C-alpha cells in the first residue's frame, strides 16, 4: 500500500502527448489509399470524356430502330414445384417441330434495304387458372456447345424473377453484332427454316430457356415465344415531301 511518503516507480516517467503531432496509423494509410483511388478514378473519367457526346439507351430494346415481332409458337406447359422446364431448345425438338404457329406483324414485310441490329427472344408467360398468386422464374444460356443436350427438367438454382408484364426478354446479339440483310421479307418468305438457320443463327446466339414458378403447387403456364427484330432502316437519298415542314 502506497502513501504520499512512499516511493512511486512512475514518478518522473509520465508523458503527455499532444494529439496535434500524432495521428492514428490506420487512418493515415486509409487516407493515402483513398487519395490514390480518387486520382485513378479522375484519370479514368478524363479518358472517357470524349464519349459524352454520344447517347445510348439504358435498355437496348428501347433504343433506336424499329421492333418487328415474329411469334414462333403458343402453347401450354405444366410446371411442377421447385423445378424448371425447358421451353426453348433450338437444337432439339423445339426447333424441329412439324408445325409452327407463326404470326407476323403487318409491318414486318419491309422490302427496302435494312440491317438487323439485334434479335431478342421474348417469352411471355401467363397463368391459365384465375386467382393464382405466384411469380414466374426463368433461366437461359447463350453459348452452349452445339452437341450439348439439355435436360428437360432441372431444379431451381438461383433463377431470375420475370419482370413487368411477365415477359422474359433476351438479347441474342454477339459481341460485334449486326446482320445486314438486303431484303428481309424475301429471305423470310422463301423458306422460314433456311431464314432461321442461315440468317439468324449464323449471326446471333442460339438460346436455351427454362421457366418455372415459385408456387408450391403444379401450375399450367401459357407461353408465347417470339423473336423480336431490332431493324435499322436506312434513310432515303431524297426526301419524299418538300415544304416548310420538312
From Swiss-Prot:
Q: Which UniProt keywords apply?
A: Viral occlusion body
Molecular function in Gene Ontology? structural molecule activity
Q: What Pfam families does the record tag this protein with?
A: Polyhedrin
Q: Name one GO cellular component term.
A: viral occlusion body
Record function comment: Major component of the virus occlusion bodies, which are large proteinaceous structures (polyhedra), that protect the virus from the outside environment for extended periods until they are ingested by insect larvae.
Q: Which family does it belong to?
A: Belongs to the polyhedrin family.
Q: What is this protein called?
A: Polyhedrin
Lineage in the entry?
A: Viruses, Viruses incertae sedis, Naldaviricetes, Lefavirales, Baculoviridae
Query: Which gene is annotated as encoding this protein in its UniProt record?
Result: PH
Amino acid at each position: 500500500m502506497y502513501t504520499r511518503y512512499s516511493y512511486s516507480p512512475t514518478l518522473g516517467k509520465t508523458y503527455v502527448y499532444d494529439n496535434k503531432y500524432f495521428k492514428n496509423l490506420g487512418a493515415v494509410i486509409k487516407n493515402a489509399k483513398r487519395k490514390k483511388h480518387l486520382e485513378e478514378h479522375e484519370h479514368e473519367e478524363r479518358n472517357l470524356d470524349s464519349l459524352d457526346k454520344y447517347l445510348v439507351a439504358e435498355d437496348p430494346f428501347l433504343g433506336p430502330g424499329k421492333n418487328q415481332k415474329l411469334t414462333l409458337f403458343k402453347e401450354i406447359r405444366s410446371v411442377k414445384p421447385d423445378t424448371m422446364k425447358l421451353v426453348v431448345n433450338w437444337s432439339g425438338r423445339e426447333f424441329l417441330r412439324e408445325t409452327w404457329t407463326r404470326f407476323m406483324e403487318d409491318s414486318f414485310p419491309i422490302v427496302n434495304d435494312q440491317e438487323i441490329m439485334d434479335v431478342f427472344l421474348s417469352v411471355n408467360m401467363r397463368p391459365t387458372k384465375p386467382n393464382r398468386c405466384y411469380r414466374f422464374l426463368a433461366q437461359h444460356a447463350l453459348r452452349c456447345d452445339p452437341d450439348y443436350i439439355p435436360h428437360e427438367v432441372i431444379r431451381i438454382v438461383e433463377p431470375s424473377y420475370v419482370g413487368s408484364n411477365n415477359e422474359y426478354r433476351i438479347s441474342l446479339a454477339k459481341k460485334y453484332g449486326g446482320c445486314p440483310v438486303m431484303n428481309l421479307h424475301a429471305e423470310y418468305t422463301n423458306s422460314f427454316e433456311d431464314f432461321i438457320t442461315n440468317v439468324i443463327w449464323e449471326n446471333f446466339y442460339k438460346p436455351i430457356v427454362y421457366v418455372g414458378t415459385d408456387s408450391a403447387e403444379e401450375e399450367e403456364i401459357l407461353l408465347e415465344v417470339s423473336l423480336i427484330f431490332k431493324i435499322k432502316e436506312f434513310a432515303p437519298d431524297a426526301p419524299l415531301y418538300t415544304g416548310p415542314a420538312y
